[in-house]
Amino acid sequence: MKKIFLGISLLLCAALCACAPREKVVIILSTNDIHAQIQNFPQLATAVAECRDTASVILVDAGDRWTGNAYVDQAEGRRPVLELMNELGYDVATLGNHEFDVGQQTLAEAIDYCRFPVICANMVSENSPIPQLKPYVILDREGEKFAFVAAVTNYGYNNHPDGHDAIFEGLRFTDAVQTLEEYEYLRDSCQVLVALTHIGSKYDRELADEASEYDLIIGGHSHERINEVEDGVLITQTGRNLNMVGVTEVRLRGKEIRSLSFRLVPLADYAPDPVYQEMVETYRNNPVLKEKAGELTATADKVGVANIFLQALKRKSGSDVAFYHYGGIRRDSLSKGDLTRSDIYDLDPFISSVS
């Protein structure tokens, strides 16, 4: 009798285990503020391929894909970075403030060129060649729904992204945090709700405090390396210039998120993918940008680079004193020896002019 009872118990236990939902793992790989620094794309390609071999992957970008490297910024339509992203199979991206640097027509063409959706909930296209973008996408992985809602900063001058007023004519931007709050209803349509933002860490934290339905905020704009939890919401960011890739591991069982964790992975840890390495070398094969434009007698750190820039500004303008905002100096150092046209461009990739 005891053997029969034990046998029935084991059968019931096996049946219950068979009915229990299995744990599913999805990896979200994220980049932000690449700023045209495509030299690490071959390493990123290796990292993405290795991850896809072992898990279901979603690959996303949080804006500012260009402005910072002459080999991209001087190319037609800033295509090199977009071609690399298309080839790598990004799943979704949002706009950063520097996406608008190229002008609205070029940006509209760039969005059309992307083989992945570019989304933004708080940009309203009223009289612009830029189309009205979708506010969100819902992606399926492992039979589960992942909703991504996006917003760009409107916290610059005149309630638009940082940049000159003229490049935003015909566009209107609603408050990013308030707009993202309006999409909390998507919680009913997905297992994981993600805000893909280019608003900076201050406003990401505000969003986490105000919109508790979000599970995850993948941010950009403030160029920080962030891995923190604010009011139960995981906030992440990878810094800038594609030195790191963000790895968010989502573990699901049934309708429940069992765990959500993030780590930053240095791309220097990976060997370059030869196909992407060849693509990057092709983009960098621009003889005009390699021409000598000057010479440095000593290596300059960022302060030294800023002084060189300001001396040129002072001389060109004929002024007694020159000022420039520190964040606009985009080279942290210059090495002793020849300076190329590319080096000069990279000092200030915003195409500023002095009259």
Q: Locations of the language-model features?
A:
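Positively charged n-region of N-terminal signal peptides that target proteins for export
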Residues: 1-4
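Acidic, metal/ion-coordinating pockets
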Residues: 19-277, 302-312, 322
